[in-house]
């Protein structure tokens, strides 16, 4: 699948990835990356033996916030949004990002699976309002039945010199020594 190729081309081997929603693709991800998988379906738990799973049952159509608290001080190179089941429910991630912005602000980029689907549209629009910009879109093809995904980046500009960074912490360190 081209998403794996894109990630391999754009992330150093061994990079930490957080994925909302896991599946058979998690097995492929763990071949190159250190993966943490948030999963609400017990049947998918531990499918990829090399992934670290966080079991987070759904509460009000979104992963249990208490189960996700463990993530608040974690840093990931990339985040993949492919859950929970029922793509319209992804809109609840916006509330979580607003409470724990660091998890996303430290990420180099965010991959949103099925970004072009009508069910996901509201989430993608709200996500862009948080300052995330489209970097890459793969519309899918006949071979993968139109499976589409998009990559978003957030630019953090140094207020001192104007240099742009993908990660908030890198921007903070830019002119800190002035």
Language-model-derived ranges and their functions:
Residues 2-60:
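SAM cofactor-binding core of SAM-dependent methyltransferases
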Residues 63-74:
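Short amphipathic alpha-helix with an adjacent loop that forms part of the alpha/beta core around
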Residues 85-155:
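C-terminal substrate-binding/active-site "lid" region of AdoMet-derived donor-dependent transferases
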């Amino acid at each position: 699948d081209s998403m794996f190729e894109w990630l391999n081309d754009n992330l150093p081997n061994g990079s930490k990835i957080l994925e909302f929603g896991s599946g058979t693709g998690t097995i492929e991800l763990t071949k190159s990356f250190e993966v943490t998988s948030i999963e609400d379906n017990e049947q998918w738990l531990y499918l990829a033996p090399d992934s670290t799973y966080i079991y987070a049952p759904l509460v009000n159509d979104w992963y249990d916030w208490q189960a996700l608290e463990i993530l608040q001080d974690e840093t990931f190179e990339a985040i993949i949004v492919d859950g929970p089941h029922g793509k319209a429910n992804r809109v609840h991630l916006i509330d979580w990002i607003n409470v724990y912005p660091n998890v996303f602000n430290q990420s180099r980029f965010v991959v949103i699976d099925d970004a072009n689907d009508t069910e996901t549209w509201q989430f993608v629009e709200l996500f862009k309002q948080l300052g995330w910009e489209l970097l890459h879109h793969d519309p899918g093809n006949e071979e993968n039945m139109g499976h589409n995904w998009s990559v978003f980046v957030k630019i953090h500009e140094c207020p001192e010199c104007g240099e742009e960074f993908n990660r908030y912490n890198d921007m903070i360190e830019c002119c800190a020594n002035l």
